[in-house]
Amino acid sequence: MLCAVYKSRKKAETYLFVERREDFSRVPEVLMSAFGRPELVLMTKLDPAKPLGIASTSRVMEALQSQGFYLQVPPPPENLLEQHKAQLKAERE
């Protein structure tokens, strides 16, 4: 399965996968508005045996077939303060 991958100019590390290049017809307007003007990053052939990074290839393929797009957002930032507090608490016990 071929797909086009676009990055957002508004949201860092946010990518939109669509079935065909320049075809955003199945992407909701509100999402396109929040995403901003898409910038093509690459055209790729999805292969379940090859990892994509954050998202699983099979999940991306399933979303493309069912809804016509897949939105990849960055993982939430680490809360270093909470980690530090938990470590201090564990050391005291």
UniProtKB/Swiss-Prot annotation:
Pfam families referenced in this protein's UniProt entry, alphabetically: YcgL
Cited InterPro entries: YcgL-like_sf, YcgL_dom
YcgL domain boundaries: 1-85
Name by which UniProt lists this protein: YcgL domain-containing protein AHA_2135
Organism: Aeromonas hydrophila subsp. hydrophila (strain ATCC 7966 / DSM 30187 / BCRC 13018 / CCUG 14551 / JCM 1027 / KCTC 2358 / NCIMB 9240 / NCTC 8049)
